[in-house]
């Protein structure tokens, strides 16, 4: 592996191979994702998630922070707030929510946990 490959991962979103999303339980084929730095064992890192029109996430709780940026489309959160392209949202550790989209959307997700102490 080249030095660049060890230090940087570039995702060409148009050519990325998205996989069915399964981080919140059962496979959700209407939601796909592409890991960038996500580590399943540590439950943190970044990824891009695509939700097809009509897709709904399962209700879930976060052990750490979940931040995301709407890249395309609109996403409605469980409290009814509509998030649009350019909106950035941050959920605190222990928070729970679910979301859905009528239009379809693409989001960049960043899950992280603060250092203990």
Map each language-model feature to its residues.
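Short glycine/proline-enriched turns and hinge-like loops at secondary-structure junctions
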Residues: 61-63, 81-83, 101-103
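A short, N-terminal "cap"/entry segment at the start of jelly-roll beta-barrel domains
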Residues: 1-42
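Structural motif
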Residues: 44-48, 68, 105
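Short acidic-glycine-tyrosine-enriched beta hairpin
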Residues: 77-97
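Conserved short histidine dyad/triad with adjacent acidic residue
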Residues: 30-62, 92-96
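Glycine- and acidic-residue-biased ligand/ion/polar-headgroup-sensing regions
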Residues: 53, 62-78
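Ligand-binding loop in jelly-roll beta-barrel domains
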Residues: 93-117
């Amino acid at each position: 592996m080249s030095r660049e490959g060890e230090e940087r991962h570039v995702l060409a979103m148009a050519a990325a191979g998205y996989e069915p999303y399964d981080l919140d339980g059962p496979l959700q084929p209407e939601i796909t994702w592409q890991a960038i730095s996500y580590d399943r064992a540590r439950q943190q890192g970044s990824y891009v998630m695509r939700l097809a029109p009509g897709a709904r996430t399962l209700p879930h709780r976060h052990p750490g922070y979940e931040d995301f940026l709407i890249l395309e489309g609109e996403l409605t959160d469980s409290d009814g707030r509509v998030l649009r392209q350019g909106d950035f949202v941050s959920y605190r550790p222990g928070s729970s929510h679910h979301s859905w989209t009528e239009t379809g959307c693409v989001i960049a997700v960043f899950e992280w946990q603060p250092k203990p102490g």
